[in-house]
Amino acid sequence: MVREKIRVSTRTLQWKCVESRIDSKRLYYGRFILSPLMKGQADTIGIAMRRVLLGEIEGTCITRVKSEKIPHEYSTIIGIEESVHEILMNLKEIVLRSNLYGTRDASICFKGPGYVTAQDIILPPSVEIVDNTQHIANVTEPVNLCIELKIERNRGYRIKTLKNFQDGSYPIDATFMPVRNVNHSIHSYVNGNEKQEILFLEIWTNGSLTPKEALYEASRNLIDLFIPFLHAEEDNFNLENNQHKVTLPLFTFHDILAKEKLRKKKKEIALKSIFIDQLELPPRIYNCLKRSNIHTLLELLNNSQEDLLKIEHFRVEDVKYILDFLEIEKHFA
């Protein structure tokens, strides 16, 4: 029997940054390539890197606001243009950079009139603000705005719940993710008789770290996940002897349902973070959706085809375009 030779590339894999730019203080962009890869490897690496970049990179943000003068979240403060809710939303958008662990205290103590911006936040030494010009509130009268802040470093999302509300203390929906978006694409080519691939990876960050730093941290996280397999000895996988048998945990239907509910919740949170601005839709479709207050992918998927056709100036062709573009027709009931 003649065995086919398996070709293995002798060239060393190399990462290279082919484009890097700063669009604003809160939007960094980087484009990287990895090559040469064997057929199928680019997709494997691209999917893994995208998941880690979006879900495993730690970030820092404001998670709680406290003030004894605030009766409830939807109240207003005399002498301040914004409502308490609007101030909380502005604080949520503040981008912070730090290497802290645990929780730190910060504060704002501003005497009006004047504009309160991110530079007015009194921070601990381990934390710095990425964009000092970010707006918080407009104090229109000579009154004091004094609030206490909690700052945390974590990963992913934290949605505020009723349990987290305390007297004069209000939690903020925390988005710890410093990576705003990730795209990967693959270029295939033939090198002699061998099919090879180049992986292109695009990374957008919020300015708290550069795309290159995010790529380094994601790579390190992936390596840490696989290190236990490198240290495992062969006899640890020998299940022939009774002493090496593995006892599997028992799951009840309640456990299974709880996990499924958690999975759906995580998916919903992820869809909330994808804005239609990122979908590169035609201007006319994009403007129609915006006018109908559809801003995220989750909001778009919550509309049926009939709902979309009720939008002013929206046509059947537009609905078909969206279905074809997203390739997720099954999500529309």
Swiss-Prot record:
Highest taxon in the source lineage: Eukaryota
An example Gene Ontology CC term for this record: chloroplast
Keyword Chloroplast set for record: yes
Assigned EC number: 2.7.7.6
Keywords linked to the UniProt accession: Chloroplast, DNA-directed RNA polymerase, Nucleotidyltransferase, Plastid, Transcription, Transferase
Annotated GO biological process: DNA-templated transcription
A GO molecular-function descriptor: protein dimerization activity
Subcellular location, principal: plastid
Localisation per UniProt entry: Plastid, Chloroplast
InterPro entries the UniProt entry points to: DNA-dir_RNA_pol_insert, DNA-dir_RNA_pol_RpoA/D/Rpb3, DNA-dir_RpoA, RBP11-like, RNAP_asu_C, RNApol_insert_sf
EC class name: transferase
Residue span of region Alpha C-terminal domain (alpha-CTD): 267-333
UniProt-listed Pfam families: RNA_pol_A_bac (PF01000), RNA_pol_A_CTD (PF03118), RNA_pol_L (PF01193)
HAMAP family in UniProt: RNApol_bact_RpoA (MF_00059)
Role this protein plays: DNA-dependent RNA polymerase catalyzes the transcription of DNA into RNA using the four ribonucleoside triphosphates as substrates.
Domain notes: The N-terminal domain is essential for RNAP assembly and basal transcription, whereas the C-terminal domain is involved in interaction with transcriptional regulators and with upstream promoter elements.
Name this polypeptide is given: DNA-directed RNA polymerase subunit alpha
Organism this protein belongs to: Glycine max (Soybean)
